[in-house]
Amino acid sequence: MKMLFTIFGWLIAVIFLILSALCLWAGNWIPAIPLILAAVLLIPPLREKLSARLGISLPFWPRLVLIPVLFMLSVYLIFAGMGNKDSIYKNADIESRLMSIYDARMETFPVPYKSRYIDTKYGKVHVIISGPEDGPPILLLHASAMSSWSWLYNIKELNSKYRTYAIDTIGDAGKSVLSNIEVYPADGPSLAALYEEIMDSLDVASAYFIGASQGGYISSNVALYAPERVNGLILCGPMGYTGTNASVFRILLTTMFPIPPLQNSATRWAFGDDPAINAVVSDWFGAILEGVISRQARPAPFSKDQINKIDMPVLLLLGSRDGLVGNPEDTEVLAENFPDARVHVLDTGHLISAEKPDRFNSLVMDFIENRKE
């Protein structure tokens, strides 16, 4: 039994040393100190030298308590170093990098547009408005860790007939700004109320909603709690229709240790292997992993009863290789509870609208044209 404990201790020590090396590689040396100390306590020769140097004994039970305490201290120091009590951004440099990338992406936006800021109870919400002024309205709600520039693959086709309002999610990276980072729409009813407030400011009585990932979760909540504002839903790899995918811990690991190999791996895993897509999202996503702690509602799974209440037309688009949402078959089964839904599974990862823009645009335009009231 003692040998078993020793082997297990060595394995945990190796893990701690690897984690401390990742901290040092990321330039975050303070959290590495408790990890190294915990590893020393787990390795008998090093522990004996430490005990002799300090002139104290280190019995088993105190060590058993001290080691997890040191580990938790390291985790706390990692996240404390990322935090900023006044902003979702770790520091001004991260924010500046992201805004520069945002502006550069908007230089490639294929249609004329105007930006508008709307004052809400949570802060300023940034909206990109484009398309014919007399066109039927569509609200575009982007995926988490993206922003409204991500619709650049679809906007030209949509604006051929429709007026679009691409909204930067408040509390996420982008040009919307929370007044207080501790006060944000954290549940379905508050999300619906916020988007009603935005629509009132835009003088939009009702609209089709196109929501990707977290944007799909937000759109679904507006449909649930303010159904009169939603003409129809286009949901692209939406959150809230399956349980939390265990692989999201990969994102957490990369956030804790933002080194290039982990960042590149996380980008490919989240957005697929398409080099063109990775070239567009990698610098943006890398900066987010390095220094953004978003403040937004966590997508709890919708119940079958809730889905059944979404009785407006729904177009559900799923990616067969989506590493974030998970198995599309599970979502398809749950989608059977929609009273009026079409479901399509595309050969894509998570960013359906960017990976297969022509197919996405065709499905969306056909859906709206055939469902007009």
Residue ranges with predicted function:
Residues 310, 316-318:
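Short beta-strand/loop motif that positions the catalytic acidic residue
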Residues 75-136, 162, 205, 369-373:
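Alpha/beta-hydrolase fold catalytic core
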Residues 341-373:
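Catalytic active-site module of serine/aspartate enzymes centered on a nucleophile-bearing elbow/loop
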Residues 217-225, 232-259:
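Flexible "cap/lid" loop of the alpha/beta hydrolase fold
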Residues 166-210:
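Active-site loop/oxyanion-hole signature of alpha/beta-hydrolase fold enzymes
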Residues 318-348, 354:
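Conserved loop-alpha-helix segment in the C-terminal half of the alpha/beta-hydrolase fold
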Residues 129-174:
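Conserved HGGG/HGGXW glycine-rich cap/lid loop of the alpha/beta-hydrolase fold
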Residues 290-306:
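Active-site nucleophile elbow and catalytic-triad environment of alpha/beta-hydrolase enzymes
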